[in-house]
Amino acid sequence: MAIHLYKTSTPSTRNGTVGSQVKSNPRNNLIYGQRRCGKGRNARGIITARHRGGGHKRLYRKIDFRRNEKDISGRIVTIEYDPNRNAYICLIHYGDGEKRYILHPRGAIIGDTIVSGTEVPISMGNALPLTDMPLGTAIHNIEITLGKGGQLARAAGAVAKLIAKEGKSATLKLPSGEVRLISKNCSATVGQVGNVGVNQKSLGRAGSKRWLGKRPVVRGVVMNPVDHPHGGGEGRAPIGRKKPTTPWGYPALGRRSRKRNKYSDSLILRRRSK
C-alpha cells in the first residue's frame, strides 16, 4: 500500500498520512448490520476492556474463510475497503454464479483468476491442503480445524511459512514467530495478505482514532488513588510498588495470560518471539 502525505494546511493534516484510496460498494446479499456489544462492557455493564466506545457504524461483510467452492475458478471483480479489518477484501465471481468475498492477497489485481481444491497450481490466491504444498511456501488464512475455515494469518501483511511435513502434521512458522504443528489436511491460501504498509500509516489527529471506536488512554500515575493503584502522591511521584499493576491490582506488563495446560501446548514447538 502506498503511503501519501497531506499538504500541511492544518495541524491534523500536517501529522497525518493516508493510504491508497480503495472505495467500498458492497453487495447487499453479502453484508448485514451488527450491534455494538456493550462497548467493552460485560453482561452486567462493567468495563472489562478499557478504551473502547463510540466509533462509526459498520456493516459486516461476509468473508469466505472456508474457500469451499472446490475446483471452480473465480475471477476477482473488485478490491474493496472493509471497516471491520485492516486488510482489503476481494469480490469473487465464480463460474457457477456464486459471489463471495475473500481476503485480498498481496499483488492480486482485478481480473486475476483463483481456484481452490486439492490439485490446483501453487499460485497466489489459490487455496489447497498443506499436504499438496511444497516446503517453503508462503501462506495465509490457515485452518486449525479441518473444515472450520481459516483462523491464522488473516491480518494485513500477515504471512506464514510451511517449513516441514512429517506424519500427519505440518510445521508452520507463524507471523508472531511461533512454530507449531497443524494437520496436513487443513487448507491454507497461497501468498501474503495485502495492504502491507498499514502499520506505517499515521492517523494524524485524535478524531480519526475515535472513528475507529478507540477512546483515550490515561496513565494510572496521573490518576487519584481511588481510581488506580499507581495514583496519588505529590507531583510526579513513583508508583510506590515493586511492579506495575492494572487498575484492579493485578500484575501488568509481562504477566503471561495464556491458560496453563491448554490442549494445544503439545502442538507448539517454539513460543512466539517477544
UniProtKB/Swiss-Prot annotation:
Domain of life: Eukaryota
Region (Disordered) location: 1-23, 223-274
Protein location: Plastid, Chloroplast
Composition bias, Polar residues: 7-23
SMART domains associated with the record: Ribosomal_L2, Ribosomal_L2_C
Any one GO biological process: mitochondrial translation
Assembly notes: Part of the 50S ribosomal subunit.
Record-level Gene Ontology MF annotations: rRNA binding; structural constituent of ribosome; transferase activity
Name recorded for this polypeptide: Large ribosomal subunit protein uL2cz/uL2cy
Keywords, sorted A to Z: Chloroplast, Plastid, Ribonucleoprotein, Ribosomal protein
TM ranges: none
Pfam entry (one): Ribosomal_L2_C
Membership in a protein family: Belongs to the universal ribosomal protein uL2 family.
PANTHER family with a match to the protein in the record: LARGE RIBOSOMAL SUBUNIT PROTEIN UL2M, RIBOSOMAL PROTEIN L2
Listed GO CC annotations: chloroplast; mitochondrial large ribosomal subunit
Primary location class: plastid
